């Protein structure tokens, strides 16, 4: 923060915002970082990292706080710059911690308090002036798109170089993941009805490798064994049947002779 910022803002506002800046550096707000413009301490920019288990997860949301010269006795105005699906972009937001409600403002509230209140309202679904209604799917899409969007913002890149590097690393990881070849076997049905699978670099035909020819000799031997066994059983049945028939004829002839 340069000395020019002190000349533009009243002493009370400057001193208070400097204290808040030191406090927020010592005790950061969860999911949020903030920096004042080097040329104007009355304009702060912030970045919200989308919290886990919310539609904003993975997103980066850039916005700004405009403090009045009467701060901390009057509240700031809050704007969201990055498309997010919750608030309109570049529009004053109507929250209890903004200049829309000076009657509810508490001069003891710090920049950390303001940013915490903003995040709390962001993850809720209550309507207010400056809010919009979108599906969770849309919010997740905007979360993904927020990375590239913010990198195009000059002020964002100048004030938050660490976040910029974080975003670039995340984009690199996403690109590497999307460029990886498909490892799952994918069926490829050819006109003759055969199904080809590619697994571990080997094309399988109907579940077998091309060189995996069935053991014909083994199959023939098994078939021959089954044929011999079936023939032996058939002969056995014929012999038993003939013996039973001969015994029956002999019994009948003996009965006739006795009569």
Swiss-Prot record:
Q: Which residues lie on this side of the membrane: Cytoplasmic?
A: 1-226
Which chain regions cross the lipid bilayer?
Answer: 227-247
Per the record, what is one GO cellular component? endoplasmic reticulum membrane
- Domain UBC core as annotated: residue spans: 12-162
Q: Which GO biological process categories is it annotated with? A: ERAD pathway; positive regulation of protein targeting to mitochondrion; protein K6-linked ubiquitination; protein polyubiquitination; response to unfolded protein; ubiquitin-dependent protein catabolic process
Do you know which PROSITE patterns this protein is assigned to? UBC_2
* Listed GO MF terms: ATP binding; ubiquitin conjugating enzyme activity; ubiquitin protein ligase binding
Q: Which residues lie on this side of the membrane: Lumenal?
A: 248-259
Q: How does it sit in the membrane?
A: Single-pass type IV membrane protein
Instruction: Report what the Swiss-Prot or TrEMBL entry states about this protein's PTMs.
Output: Auto-ubiquitinated.
Compartment(s) of residence: Endoplasmic reticulum membrane
* SUPFAM superfamilies, A to Z: UBC-like
Family annotation (InterPro entries): Ub_conjugating_enzyme (IPR050113), UBQ-conjugat_E2_core (IPR000608), UBQ-conjugating_enzyme/RWD (IPR016135)
Alphabetical keyword list: ATP-binding, Endoplasmic reticulum, Membrane, Nucleotide-binding, Transferase, Transmembrane, Transmembrane helix, Ubl conjugation, Ubl conjugation pathway, Unfolded protein response
**Predominant location category:** endoplasmic reticulum
Q: What is its EC number?
A: 2.3.2.23
Q: Which residues form the active site?
A: 94
Task: Name the protein family.
Answer: Belongs to the ubiquitin-conjugating enzyme family.
**What is the protein's given name?**
Ubiquitin-conjugating enzyme E2 J2
């Amino acid at each position: 923060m340069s000395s020019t910022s002190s000349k533009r803002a009243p002493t009370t506002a400057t001193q208070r915002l400097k204290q808040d800046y030191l406090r927020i550096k010592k005790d950061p707000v969860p999911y949020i970082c903030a920096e004042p413009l080097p040329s104007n301490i009355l304009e702060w920019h912030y970045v919200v990292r989308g919290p886990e288990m919310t539609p904003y997860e993975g997103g980066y949301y850039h916005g700004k706080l405009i403090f009045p010269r009467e701060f901390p006795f009057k509240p700031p105005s809050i704007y969201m710059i990055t498309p997010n699906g919750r608030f309109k972009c570049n529009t004053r937001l109507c929250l209890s911690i903004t200049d829309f409600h000076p009657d509810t403002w508490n001069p003891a509230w710090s920049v950390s308090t303001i940013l915490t209140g903003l995040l709390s309202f962001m993850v809720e679904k209550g309507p207010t002036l400056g809010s919009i209604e979108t599906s969770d799917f849309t919010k997740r899409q905007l979360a993904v798109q927020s990375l590239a969007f913010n990198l195009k913002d000059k002020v964002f890149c100048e004030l938050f170089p660490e976040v910029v590097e974080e975003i670039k690393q995340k984009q690199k990881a996403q690109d590497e993941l999307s460029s990886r070849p498909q490892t799952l076997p994918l069926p490829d049905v050819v006109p003759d009805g055969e199904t080809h699978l590619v697994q571990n670099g080997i094309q399988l035909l109907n579940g077998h490798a091309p060189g995996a020819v069935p053991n014909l000799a083994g199959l023939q031997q098994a078939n021959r064994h089954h044929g011999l066994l079936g023939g032996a059983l058939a002969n056995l049945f014929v012999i038993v049947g003939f013996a039973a028939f001969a015994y029956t004829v002999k019994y009948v002839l003996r009965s006739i002779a006795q009569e």
